[in-house]
């Protein structure tokens, strides 16, 4: 989720963009050989997107009307993998998580700021059919991962993985009217023009005793954004480097608690993005500048076996 001040200079690009997914992934595994295990799973996902922006820039009250988009859908995907153990101290894993295609539906509501210009424009836009049901199709990318784990001693284990995510499945994110006077017409196109992206990670586990394990890691995560002219205010992403530390507590054979902390160095992201494909003929203007920021990420996971 990303939020801006309501009246920031790029408000006709976005004021708020929020995407949430819920994934339920039942899976089965089969030990085909003493050195080879296979796994397969189905993924049911629930996706929701909320998107707010000004109607546009320029004269005529467009900066006095907000458009609020709300879309959702259910979708299915699958995942599979194998684990090969060439020796008692080495494991090699291959896995793939499929692309998931959403056919999202919802609506757009228009709101005036209460000014005379805003109220007049709102009445005109509603009368012309711009407040309506919406539909959009988007494919979330598939990911392929190769991983290796090597036991160096009774206490130390080295880890590494490389993954490729098919972000090029998202070229344009088109939102279309699906009811009323504008049925079948384009409401907005969000130009993404993503590329496939790589992630490379290395790590180590240190077994302090039978109950406690310490974890260390570093990762390089490539952005799918190609250049400043295709970087979106909805996703001002750039390349990242992760430094992480964690611990695992295993009080008994059936319980496990993992805690992790990561600091993410994000490369400064320049943007020079112009939006001209808004339906009423007024453009969204150009946003030009630079995003700066780093992240702290805290995670916790508890596992219970039965």
Regions found by a protein language model. Give the residues of each.
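Outer-membrane beta-barrel porins/channels
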Residues: 1-306
């Amino acid at each position: 989720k990303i939020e801006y001040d309501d009246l920031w200079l790029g408000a006709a690009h976005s004021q708020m963009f929020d995407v949430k997914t819920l994934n339920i992934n039942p899976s089965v595994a089969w030990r085909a050989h003493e050195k080879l295990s296979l796994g397969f799973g189905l993924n049911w996902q629930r996706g929701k997107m909320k998107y707010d922006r000004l109607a546009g820039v320029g004269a005529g009250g467009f900066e006095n009307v907000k458009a609020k988009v709300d879309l959702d859908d259910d979708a299915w995907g699958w995942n599979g993998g194998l684990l090969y153990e060439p020796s008692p101290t080495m494991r090699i894993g291959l896995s793939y998580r499929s692309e998931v295609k959403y056919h999202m539906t919802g609506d757009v509501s228009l709101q005036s700021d209460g000014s005379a210009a805003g109220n007049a424009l709102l009445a005109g836009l509603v009368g012309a059919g711009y407040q309506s049901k919406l539909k959009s199709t988007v494919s979330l990318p598939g990911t392929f991962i190769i991983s290796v784990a090597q036991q160096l001693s009774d206490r130390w284990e080295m880890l590494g993985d490389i993954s490729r995510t098919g972000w090029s499945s998202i070229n344009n994110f088109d939102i279309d009217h699906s009811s009323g006077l504008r049925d079948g017409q384009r409401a907005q196109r969000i130009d993404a023009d993503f590329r496939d992206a790589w992630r490379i990670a290395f790590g180590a586990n240190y077994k302090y005793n039978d109950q406690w394990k310490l974890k260390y890691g570093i990762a390089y995560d490539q952005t799918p954004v190609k250049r400043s002219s295709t970087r979106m205010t909805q996703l001002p992403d750039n390349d990242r480097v992760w430094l992480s530390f964690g611990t695992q507590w295993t009080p008994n054979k059936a319980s496990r608690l993992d805690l992790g902390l990561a600091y993410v160095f994000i490369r400064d992201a320049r943007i020079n993005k112009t939006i001209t494909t808004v339906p009423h003929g007024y453009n969204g203007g150009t946003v030009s500048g630079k995003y700066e920021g780093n992240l702290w990420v805290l995670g916790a996971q508890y596992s219970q076996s039965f």
